[in-house]
Amino acid sequence: RGPATLVDETVRKVWQIDLSKVTVSGTDWDETVASIVKKSSYELGISNENVVTLGIEAHLYKVLLYEKGGHFKPHKDTVKEDGMFGTLVIQLPSLFTGSDSNVSHQGQSKRFKLSKDCETSFQYTAFYGDCEHEILPVTDGWRFCLVYNLVVTKPNKDGVFPDSRGMEKTVTMLQAEAAKWLTTNSGRVG
């Protein structure tokens, strides 16, 4: 709740590793995260130019380990630092089943199968702070992930995001794609 972490296993069952005990590094890890930030920001409707202009960065916030039965009931993330507008979860390769994620916003939901190819590759999910999301129970194995705050480090003079004039084409494209998706899926989620 807020900056405090309450322990209630009916709401959330996951191991959290203290960041002071974690070093995330590798030959190209920083470049990999920067690439994921750019791609996920674009998928959230932010142009590549605005990713640079706004100085969008991912700041490591938590390292989580879900064991069998691990889950997190529907919730919205709280703002943890200035400029935070969303969350990026990078799932590291580990073998598990279950643990699908549901992300909802304004009556629309999308389910992500996080266990697909989980043992051989890392995956990511990103969402805005006003999206409700949950992690369904792990049915077997261990799910290991890094949780980052998506942060604007260089806001413009009017606020965090630039004016929407440059995003009109993106909004129109997203509306068309959403309409096609709804027609094809008849409103089904999955």
Cite the ranges covered by each PLM segment.
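Intrinsically disordered, low-complexity boundary segments flanking structured domains
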Residues: 42-53, 77, 89-90, 134-135, ...
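Alpha-helical interaction elements in eukaryotic regulators
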Residues: 32-36, 40, 84, 131, ...
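Eukaryotic intrinsically disordered, low-complexity regulatory regions
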Residues: 153-190
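Intrinsically disordered, low-complexity regions
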Residues: 3, 14, 135, 168-171, ...
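Signature of the catalytic double-stranded beta-helix
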Residues: 2-70, 76-79
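Catalytic core of non-heme Fe(II) oxygenases with the double-stranded beta-helix
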Residues: 56-59, 63-159
